[in-house]
């Protein structure tokens, strides 16, 4: 039995399979996940688990070189944006239109759905290398 880190076997598998520049999405309960993208659904009830809790745990295990965030979060959910920035102080952030972020999920290895119900609580993480 795994003792530490992300306990969800599907998340652990996807992270272990990530290569340089692969994408992994993490987001709120309302995000439409493309049929071709694996969905790892963690939602239990509204707000559980939270987007930030899941993101923080994923970031403990995944080397991230870049994060894509919907530009709409700047005006529609600035509190969440500040929380995201605190989790990745040294990672490049690129803001893109929300419609583009949703389309880009087609190229992600997987999408982790949380119970979050606040607007634009979605990111795409681009995997880096550890050497």
From Swiss-Prot:
GO cellular component: cytosol
Catalysed reactions listed for this entry: beta-D-ribopyranose = beta-D-ribofuranose
Keywords: Carbohydrate metabolism, Cytoplasm, Isomerase
Catalytic activity, EC: 5.4.99.62
Active-site residues (renumbered): 20 (proton donor)
Top-rank EC class of the record's enzyme: isomerase
Pathway recorded for this protein: Carbohydrate metabolism; D-ribose degradation; D-ribose 5-phosphate from beta-D-ribopyranose: step 1/2
Binding of substrate, residues: 28, 98, 120-122
One GO MF term: intramolecular lyase activity
Keyword Isomerase appears in the UniProt entry: yes
GO biological process: D-ribose catabolic process
Keyword Ribosomal protein: no
Pfam families from the UniProt entry: RbsD_FucU
Compartment(s): Cytoplasm
Top-rank taxon, per record: Bacteria
Function noted in UniProt: Catalyzes the interconversion of beta-pyran and beta-furan forms of D-ribose.
Oligomer status and interactors: Homodecamer.
Family: Belongs to the RbsD / FucU family. RbsD subfamily.
HAMAP family: D_rib_pyranase
PANTHER family: D-RIBOSE PYRANASE
Protein name per UniProt: D-ribose pyranase
